[in-house]
Amino acid sequence: MAEYVNYVLGSLYVSDTATSTIPTDVRNFIAPPFPLNFWSGPTFTVRSNTRADPLKLVAARHRAAAAAIDTLEAQSQYGVANVDALIRPLERQVAKVADALAALEDAARAAESADAATPQVNASEADQRPDNIGQSLSEIQIAKNDVPMEFDTNLAVDLLATVFVSRAAGGSNGVVFGTWYRALQDRLVTERPVATRSIDYRDGRMSKTFMTTAVVSLQSCGRLYIGNRPYSAFEAAVLCLHLAHRAVNSNYTYPTSFSGLIEQLPVYIEAFSTALGDGTLGKVGYEFNGARLPKNQFHVPGGGGRYERGALNGHGVLETLIRLKVLPAIPGSLGTTSTAVGPELDADQTAYIDDVNKAAAAFLVRAQNLFLTEDQTLLRSTINTITALLLLRRLLWNGNVYTDRLRNNFQLGAIVPNLAVSQRDARGASGGDAAAMVSRSGNNNFTFLCERYVSPIYIANREVELTQLFPGLAALCLDAQTVARDQPQHRAVNVSTGRNQTNLTRLIGIELENRRRTAPVPINEVLAAHDAVALQYERGLGLLMQKPRLRASLEETRRLGQFNVASDYDLLYFVCLGYIPSLTSAM
C-alpha cells in the first residue's frame, strides 16, 4: 500500500480549476500529501517513559528560578548604585546647610554677647547704679523677704520645670496647683482626648506639659498676634500714665528713661485712680460699648485701624485720658474729616495733638510713630493694660508678706535648691514676727514689684505685655464670670469652674494638638480661640473692677482658695507666676 493518497486525476494546479473538470469523488480533496499514519504516531499516544517528564519539568523550573534570581540580584545592585548616586548630592547639600546654620548660630551668639556687653541707659534709681544693670537682666525679686531669683526666658515656665524636677527627685509626681487647674485638666481630658495624648495624667496627677501650656495660654491673653507694631500695649500704657501724671502734677521730678517710668508706675496709678473719680459724677465704667464692637473678634475687622464710631465709648479710663488731653479726640467725634473743628470746641486748635507720640519719641527713640487713635486695636489693648494695673493695685493694697511662713502654701525653700536665707531675710518665720508687723503696707508691695520684677523683665524683653508679667491676674479675670453669677445673698460655693473656661480649654487643646500633628490647626482657628480668651479676659477686668470690696468678695467666695492662695504672700507670687504649687506625699 502506498504511503500517500492517490487522487483520481492526479495532481492539479489550483489556477486550472476554472477550466478543468473534476469528477465527484471523496478522494478528490485538494490538500498536500498527508501521512496516512499521522494520527497513530507517538505524539498522540501515551508514552512509555512517564518518569522522565517530571524530572525535566522540575529541572526547567529550577533553571528559570535561578535565572530570575540572577536578574533580581543584578537589578538590586544597579538600584543601590543609583540610590547612592542620588543621595550623595543631597548629603553634600545637607552638609552645606549645617555649616550655614552653625555659622548663623555663632553669629547670633556673638551678637548676644555684644548686646550683653553694651552698656544700658536707665533712669531714676537705675541712673545711679549702672553697674547693676547687667545683673538685673536675669535677676528678679518678688517678695521683700525672699532672695532674688534668676530666670532664663520665662520665669513662670522655668520655675514650673524646677517644681516638677524637685518633686521627681524623690521618685514621685505629687504636685497640685488647686482645684481650678484640676477642673481645667479634667475638662480637657474629657472633651479633647486627642490633645491629651501628649500629657501624663495617670493616677490623677497634674501634667507638667498641661500646666506649662496653660500658663503660656494665660500669658497670651493680652498679646496682639495680628499686625506688626513697633510698640507694645504695655509701653503705650506706661506712656499714657506718665502723661496723665504730668497733667495733674506740675511740680514733680520725673525719670529720664523708660525703665525709670516703670519704677514710678505705682505713683502714676495712684494719681490716675484719683483722676478717675474726680471726672465722673456717678459710677466709673470699665467696659466698652459692646453693641458696636465686632462680635467674637478683638481686632479691628477688615485690617483697618478704627472700630465703628462710638465703639470705645463708655470706658472710664479712655474718657479720663481724653479729658486730661493725654490722648486726642477719637477721629470723627468732633466732626467729619471735611469739616474743621470750630473755635467753640477747640479754641487753641490742639484737639488732635498727640502727646503719646511725642513721649514715645523721647523715651523709646525708635523712629516710629505711635498714634493710638489711628490704631484702635492697640488703643483697646492699652486701655485694658491700664485697667489691669488698676486692678493689680487693688489686689496688692495693704498686703502683708511678713506673716507666719507656715501659713503660706507657697514655700520657695522647697522648690529652689541650695536656698541660703540669711537671718535678715527670714522675717515672718514665726507668729511673733507677724504680730510685730501689723502696720499697713499701702502700696509698698506694688512699688517693690515694679522696681525688682517688672523693670528687670522689661529690660530683658522689650516686647513683654502685662499678661506675660502677671498670668495670675489673667486667671482671676477669666474666672470673673463665675464670680459675677454669685448673688449677694447667695451663700452656696460655686465649684463649676470647668464649664466657664471653655475658651481657655479650647486654646490649650489646640496648642497641645499642634505639637503632635504633622499638619497644624489652621491659623484662623488659632486666632479665633485666642480672640475668645482675650474677650473673656477683657470682660473679666470690667467685672472685677466694679466690685467695691474686691479682696473680701474673692475670699468669701473661695475664688482665691481654688488657686491655692492662702495669704498675701501667696497672692503676690500667684499674680506673678499664675500658680501656687503644693507638694504632696505619694499615695
Curated annotation (Swiss-Prot):
Keyword annotations: Capsid protein, Host nucleus, Host-virus interaction, Viral genome packaging, Viral penetration into host nucleus, Viral release from host cell, Virion, Virus entry into host cell
GO BP annotations, alphabetical order: symbiont entry into host cell; viral genome packaging; viral penetration into host nucleus
GO CC, one annotated term: host cell nucleus
Positions of region (Interaction with major capsid protein/MCP): 1-53
InterPro entries: Herpes_UL25 (IPR002493)
Pfam families: Herpes_UL25
Chain intervals for the UniProt region annotation (Disordered): 113-132
Cell compartments where the protein resides: Virion; Host nucleus
Known function: Capsid vertex-specific component that plays a role during viral DNA encapsidation, assuring correct genome cleavage and presumably stabilizing capsids that contain full-length viral genomes. Participates in the interaction between the capsid and the tegument through interaction with the large tegument protein/LTP.
Family (UniProt): Belongs to the herpesviridae CVC2 protein family.
Subunit and interaction comment: Heterodimerizes with CVC1. Interacts with major capsid protein/MCP and triplex capsid protein 1/TRX1 at the pentamer vertices. Interacts with the large tegument protein/LTP.
Protein name: Capsid vertex component 2
Organism per entry: Equine herpesvirus 1 (strain V592) (EHV-1)
